[in-house]
């Protein structure tokens, strides 16, 4: 019947919106973790540069730490992009006119 079909579609929409909300929440968590990783990698690179200046490290190790810090920053940017995309999908799926600027 028409009511059953409508209820099924409503349930499917609800499941999809809930899934998008979960993705957005997980994306927020990923950004926080990536930011922590970036901060730690930056600290490690700075510490290695100080060790190098004191003669306790070599250029290769400094370079590896700096490369790790750069990679962490890229992962953070990717996480921020994914968070923005997840939020945009959620806003579009819920037809949040205020968020869409309509």
Regions found by a protein language model. Name each.
Residues 1-75, 82-93:
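Amphipathic alpha-helical coiled-coil segments
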Residues 91-102:
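Terminal intrinsically disordered/low-complexity segments used for targeting and assembly
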């Amino acid at each position: 019947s028409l009511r059953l079909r409508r209820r099924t579609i409503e349930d499917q929409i609800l499941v999809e919106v809930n899934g998008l909300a979960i993705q957005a929440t997980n994306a927020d968590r990923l950004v926080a973790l990536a930011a922590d990783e970036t901060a730690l990698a930056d600290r490690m690179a700075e510490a290695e540069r100080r060790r190098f200046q004191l003669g306790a490290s070599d250029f290769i190790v400094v370079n590896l730490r700096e490369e790790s810090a750069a990679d962490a920053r890229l992962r953070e940017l990717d996480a921020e992009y994914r968070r923005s995309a997840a939020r945009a999908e959620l806003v579009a799926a819920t037809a949040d006119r205020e968020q869409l600027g309509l």
